[in-house]
């Protein structure tokens, strides 16, 4: 009878497809606690050992998911300091706990105050200090270590961030130009997690390209998990916008936007999310040029795309930005046929090289200015 009831109560729901199971983790919440300070010894004036601290170290090649698998209960603690004794007047310090985290992690406390930005390999930060050992100042009673909740927020570090609406062909392009193998299908939101591909060149130079899930209108207000995806382009050096030359319609309930309206809409989403993103250099790809009528549309919209401010008057008010983008270049392509893909790779490289040269000159001028300020009237001026 028991077996019959088990059979009847057994759920007939099929498990979720592997594609929709969460495999990309970009946030993690941890409870961290520094070690308790050791007690002192009043009779001999002994001092207890300092409690150990918890610190993070950034390591390349690590992911938050791998890190989380090693921290099942999401709790991290350092060891306590040693009590003072007759044979050890000064107690030994507690052992520190070292936790490796992915490069690109930002550490926040519960009040969303930034504690550390670990964007370089081997960068370190203490997230929970150890308690003070017992001494005359605290009646020889060791103090508890720092106890707090920290949130780890991973922002992908890539040279180029690929931005666009769903079904624009971003994953197809990523597969064509890099070693990545993203899922590709003829429906929106095929990409449901960020992916990074590497563009390799004949001289062994490589460029990393981050493909983000498609945005929707209102992404700046976190519609469609917009914040979860937009944050990953903050650390990219170059933005690569990709737009369907025939426009895009999210669903029958949403209006159809032509390619110009889509460009303005993406422009506005970035402007509302973080205006500083508009200062990043950007390249525009107009995709699906292999279809009939594409070149007629291109001829019509190209002069406006060259100067987006000239088309603001005709832009729908709900997608009209206050400040427009200025594209470094505009490349019409067919990602599915790999048309002009080589040109895209060359353009990305040229733009990044030009940015590096500008940064080098800027850094040199800054160093020169700092040296002049230090020398002042004491030594010769640098000319």
UniProtKB/Swiss-Prot annotation:
Cell division in keyword set: no
Domain (Obg): residue spans on this chain: 22-157
Domain of life: Eukaryota
Domain OBG-type G stretches: 158-353
Binding site for GTP: 164-171, 211-215, 287-290
This protein's GO CC annotations: mitochondrion; nucleolus
Entry similarity comment: Belongs to the TRAFAC class OBG-HflX-like GTPase superfamily. OBG GTPase family.
Protein's recorded name: GTP-binding protein 10 homolog
The organism's taxonomic lineage, starting at the top: Eukaryota, Metazoa, Ecdysozoa, Arthropoda, Hexapoda
């Amino acid at each position: 009878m028991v077996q019959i009831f088990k059979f009847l109560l057994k759920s007939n729901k099929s498990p979720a497809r592997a594609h929709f199971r969460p495999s990309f983790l970009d946030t993690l919440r941890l409870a961290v606690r520094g070690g308790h300070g050791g007690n002192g010894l009043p009779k001999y004036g002994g001092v207890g050992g300092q409690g150990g601290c918890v610190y993070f170290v950034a390591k390349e090649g690590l992911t938050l998911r791998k890190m989380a698998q090693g921290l099942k209960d999401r709790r991290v603690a350092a060891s306590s300091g040693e009590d003072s004794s007759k044979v050890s007047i000064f107690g030994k310090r507690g052992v520190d706990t070292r936790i490796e985290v992915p490069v690109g992690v930002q550490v926040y406390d519960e009040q969303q105050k930034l504690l550390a930005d670990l964007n370089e390999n081997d960068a370190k930060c203490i997230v929970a200090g150890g308690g003070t050992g017992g001494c005359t100042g605290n009646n020889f009673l060791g103090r508890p270590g720092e106890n707090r909740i920290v949130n780890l927020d991973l922002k992908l570090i890539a040279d180029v961030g690929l931005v666009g609406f769903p079904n624009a062909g971003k994953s197809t392009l990523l597969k064509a130009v890099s070693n990545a193998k993203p899922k590709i299908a003829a429906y929106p939101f095929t990409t449901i997690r960020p992916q990074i591909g590497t563009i390799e060149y004949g001289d062994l130079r490589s460029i990393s390209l981050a493909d983000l899930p498609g945005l929707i209108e209102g992404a700046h207000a976190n519609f469609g998990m917009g914040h979860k995806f937009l944050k990953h382009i903050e650390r990219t050096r170059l933005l690569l916008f990709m737009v369907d030359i025939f426009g895009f319609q999210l669903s029958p309930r949403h209006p159809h936007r032509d390619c110009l309206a889509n460009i303005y809409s993406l422009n506005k989403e970035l402007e509302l999310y973080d205006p500083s993103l508009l200062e990043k250099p950007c390249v525009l790809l107009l995709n699906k040029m292999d279809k009939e009528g594409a070149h007629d549309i291109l001829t019509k919209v190209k002069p406006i795309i060259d100067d987006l401010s000239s088309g603001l008057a005709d832009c729908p008010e709900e997608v009209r930005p206050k400040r427009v983008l200025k594209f470094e270049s505009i490349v019409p392509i067919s990602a599915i046929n790999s048309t002009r893909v080589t040109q895209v790779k060359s353009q990305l490289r040229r733009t990044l090289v030009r940015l590096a040269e500008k940064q080098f000159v800027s850094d040199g001028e800054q160093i020169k200015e700092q040296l002049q300020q230090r020398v002042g009237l004491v030594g010769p001026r640098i000319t």
